Amino acid sequence: MLVLVINSGSSSLKYQLRELADDGADGPRPVLAKGLVERIGVPGSDVPDHAAALERVEAEVFRVIGDRPIDAAGHRVVHGGERFTAAALVTNEVIRAIERLAPLAPLHNPAAAQGLRAMTERYPDMPQVVVFDTSFHQTMPREAWQYALPESVYREHGIRRYGFHGTSHDLVAGMAARHLGVAREEFSGIVLHLGNGASATAIRDGASVDTSMGFTPLAGLVMGTRTGDLDPSVVTHLMRTQGRSAEEMDTLMNKESGLLGLAGHADMRQVVEAADAGDRRARTALDVASYRLAKYVGGYHVAVGGAQAIVFTAGIGENSAPFRARVVQRLGALGVELDAAANEAGLSGAGDDGVAVISAPGSAIPVLVIPTDEEQAIARLTWELTRG
């Protein structure tokens, strides 16, 4: 089965063509084609809209597969609000619902809807599926998602914690459960999705019960350019005393902070290199980021009733042995012990199931490194919803 995975941005369209076994068997499947169409709708661009972008995708894809038909398309959508608790088959009403959720994700949902409409017009008979970053976290109990604001703020404006990276957390939790030999619905653990954007999720009995991101992906951990958790009064203080606008504060917190603000580098590799060379700012950035993450791990160990595993995934989680070590070294109170050699080996020391164990044999909680593959997860969900 050929599945085209689409991630539509406001001025870009990222795609992968994945081939799945007809029986939906698990396991890595080949990426037949992938690419990125940029500058959509930008003045002077030769790609005026998402329909034109799809023409480019089509040309590249069919250069690879010839006259083989694409069986289905799966779309990543950032925000599903409270309506979408799982992936859904695309209909006009689903697209309209995504558009109505635009106030919760003004940069992402309108672009996703444009991509969906362009795809539907070009391939009206092709089954399509939408997969939401937020859906996995809709199992959070109210005490985890509700802010201590007046109830009317939630009812009238939808202000609550939603969480993101759900597709990745869901996929990796399933792989961790299989590695441990427990049923998915019996797995309780902590998944750390650490990339330029980063989030931690507490999983109890296979379901998300808490996650570090909140109303937006700004909350939680220290990220490449995002603050993570911040006293909201800092925002009003800077607006009052410096005359900063809401847009300027958005830029400061989302694009100029995090590792970039602390160390001058948004890339974890550069921060680690600078710290090793004696850069004080870089060392401070690593201390702040690892301390923040370790606090979340400790809290989520309580939230899940005792974690069966702590899992690192995504770009930093999979590839930065120095940062993993800094985090795990802070977890001694939980009885967690690192195997330094296994940590250095990382995924090169993974077993046949693709999972690397980086904790020492005597560690109270296994520490795992598991590669995420959100496009593969979207492709598989697309297969599941369209096979019948």
From Swiss-Prot:
Record's keyword annotation contains Transferase: yes
- Which of this chain's residues are annotated to bind Mg(2+)? N7, E374
Look at the named UniProt entry and state the broad enzyme category this protein falls under. transferase
**BP-aspect Gene Ontology terms:** acetate metabolic process; acetyl-CoA biosynthetic process
User: In the Enzyme Commission scheme, what number(s) does this protein have?
Assistant: 2.7.2.1
GO terms for cellular component: cytoplasm
Which locations, inside or outside the cell, does it occupy? Answer: Cytoplasm
One matching Pfam family, short form? Answer: Acetate_kinase
Question: Molecular function (GO) terms listed?
Answer: acetate kinase activity; ATP binding; magnesium ion binding
Q: In which pathway does it act?
A: Metabolic intermediate biosynthesis; acetyl-CoA biosynthesis; acetyl-CoA from acetate: step 1/2
Q: Which UniProt keywords apply?
A: ATP-binding, Cytoplasm, Kinase, Magnesium, Metal-binding, Nucleotide-binding, Transferase
Q: Where is this site: Transition state stabilizer?
A: H165, R226
- Binding of substrate, residues: R76
Q: Identify the residues that bind ATP.
A: K14, H193, L194, G195, N196, G197, D267, M268, R269, G315, I316, G317, E318, N319
Family the UniProt entry places it in: Belongs to the acetokinase family.
User: What is the annotated role of this protein in its UniProt record?
Assistant: Catalyzes the formation of acetyl phosphate from acetate and ATP. Can also catalyze the reverse reaction.
Subunit organization: Homodimer.
Listed name of the protein = Acetate kinase
Which species does the entry assign this protein to? Micrococcus luteus (strain ATCC 4698 / DSM 20030 / JCM 1464 / CCM 169 / CCUG 5858 / IAM 1056 / NBRC 3333 / NCIMB 9278 / NCTC 2665 / VKM Ac-2230) (Micrococcus lysodeikticus)
